[in-house]
C-alpha cells in the first residue's frame, strides 16, 4: 500500500524506549506518527473538543500496549468499541508473551491484529500499512454514503418518483402513464435525476442505490 499523505499512526505505550523506536521505524518508512505515554493521555486526546493532530475523517491506526499504568490498553480498546471507531482507527496490540491470549481475544472482538514483543520491523510495518488501508477504505465508503444521502436529499418529490420507476426498468412512456404526466416531463425529470446523482444511465443509477 502507498499510505495516504494524511495518514497517521498513533503509538500508545508507557515505555519511552518503545515509543522512540517505533517512531523512528515509522519515520524511516515515511509514516507520520504521534506518540502518547498512556492510554489516559490518548483517551483525553480523542475526547478533546478541538484537536489539530487527527480527526475521524483522516486515515489512521493505533499501536496499543496491553499493560500500562492507569488505564490499560484493553480499557481504551473498550472505549473505541463503544464509539464504533475500530474500522476507522484499527488497533494493533503490542504485547509481551504473557499477554498473547488476551491479545488474541481482543482480535476476536475486533482488534486488527497483535504483534508480540520483540517484533519484526518489516512484519509490523506490513500490518500497519494494511490497517491504514482498512481505515482509508472505511472512510471512502462513509464519504460515498454521505454523498449519496446528500444527492437524494436534493431530489424533488417528483424526481424521486421518476427515479424509483426508472430503477424498476420502466420506459418513459409507462412512467408518464403511471405518474399522469407527459413523456417530455418524464424526460426532464429523468435528466435532472441523472445530473444530481452524477450518473449516466439507469443501470449506473440502480448500482449506486444498491451500493455497488
Q: Residue ranges of each PLM-predicted region?
A:
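Basic, Lys/Arg-enriched C-terminal extension of HTH/homeodomain DNA-binding domains
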Residues: 191-212
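C-terminal output helix
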Residues: 101, 115-128
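Receiver (REC) domain active-site loop signature in two-component systems and cognate sites
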Residues: 68
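Active-site residues of response regulator receiver
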Residues: 64-65, 95
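Short amphipathic alpha-helix used as the core "switch/output" element in two-component signaling
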Residues: 74-87, 105
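Acidic catalytic/metal-coordinating carboxylates
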Residues: 37-38, 72-78, 201
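Acidic, metal-coordinating helix/loop segments flanking the phosphotransfer/catalytic sites
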Residues: 35-61
Amino acid at each position: 500500500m502507498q499510505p495516504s499523505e494524511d495518514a497517521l499512526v498513533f503509538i500508545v505505550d508507557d515505555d519511552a524506549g518503545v515509543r522512540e523506536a517505533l517512531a523512528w521505524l515509522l519515520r524511516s518508512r515515511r509514516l507520520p506518527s504521534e506518540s502518547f505515554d498512556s492510554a489516559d493521555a490518548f483517551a483525553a486526546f480523542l475526547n478533546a473538543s478541538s484537536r489539530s493532530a487527527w480527526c475521524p475523517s483522516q486515515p489512521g491506526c493505533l499501536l496499543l500496549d496491553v499493560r500500562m499504568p492507569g488505564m490499560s490498553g484493553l480499557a481504551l480498546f473498550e472505549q473505541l468499541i463503544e464509539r464504533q471507531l475500530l474500522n476507522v482507527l484499527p488497533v494493533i496490540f503490542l504485547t509481551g508473551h504473557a499477554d498473547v491470549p488476551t491479545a488474541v481475544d481482543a482480535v476476536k472482538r475486533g482488534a486488527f491484529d497483535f504483534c508480540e514483543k520483540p517484533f519484526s520491523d518489516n512484519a509490523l510495518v506490513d500490518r500497519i500499512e494494511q490497517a491504514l488501508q482498512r481505515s482509508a477504505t472505511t472512510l471512502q465508503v462513509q464519504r460515498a454514503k454521505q454523498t449519496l444521502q446528500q444527492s437524494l436529499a436534493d431530489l424533488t418529490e417528483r424526481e424521486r418518483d421518476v427515479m424509483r420507476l426508472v430503477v424498476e426498468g420502466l420506459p418513459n412512456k409507462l412512467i408518464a402513464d403511471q405518474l399522469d404526466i407527459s413523456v417530455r416531463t418524464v424526460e426532464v425529470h429523468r435528466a435532472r435525476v441523472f445530473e444530481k446523482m452524477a450518473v449516466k444511465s439507469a443501470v449506473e443509477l440502480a448500482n449506486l442505490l444498491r451500493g455497488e
